Amino acid sequence: MIRLSEQSPLGTGRHRKCYAHPEDAQRCIKIVYHRGDGGDKEIRRELKYYAHLGRRLKDWSGIPRYHGTVETDCGTGYVYDVIADFDGKPSITLTEFAEQCRYEEDIAQLRQLLKQLKRYLQDNRIVTMSLKPQNILCHRISESEVIPVVCDNIGESTLIPLATWSKWCCLRKQERLWKRFIAQPALAIALQKDLQPRESKTLALTSREA
């Protein structure tokens, strides 16, 4: 049995807490702690969608892989890839990335990240219940390359999951969610900033503000 009760979680959501896997630095363990408040329903929905993706998805760069369950002293643990930068530091959220924008180059990089994210979701027909900047990690795989990763709200909760099985329904849902996503304050404020170009020619942003 894996002991997690003495660990501080990496993050806490509405229904789940995420812990570092004590036996594998490349993975994390999520624990459902609000089972009676929709937590069980959420994990069942997510795992059902992951099973669907496991049969067809070839490019996993934009979402964490799921690796099954383990027993912990906090209950059943669900094991996923941990998203960390090439230098070992935790990847920051898109919200944090947007808040760090100080120069024209930063905004250009933010726009490029958003373009990458939208293309990945469309090309791979990834269905999400919602899109929120705080649930998207900016995975820095080198000094010059960042990949957006959706780490929560994957799948759909409708009785008949049309977007999961129909490309047309999937694209329509994605467009609706994208409009709401771009309008969220964390992104809207950053994208409307009137910024000056930076004087140096270094990379605009990394995982931590310079």
UniProtKB/Swiss-Prot annotation:
| InterPro entries in alphabetical order | Kinase-like_dom_sf (IPR011009), PhoP_reg_network_YrbL (IPR019647)
Cellular component terms, GO, for this chain's entry? plasma membrane
Induction, as annotated: Induced by low extracellular levels of magnesium via the PhoQ/PhoP two-component regulatory system.
Q: Which domain of life is it from?
A: Bacteria
UniProt-recorded name of the protein: Uncharacterized protein YrbL
Species source reads: Escherichia coli (strain K12)
What would be the name of the gene that encodes this protein? yrbL
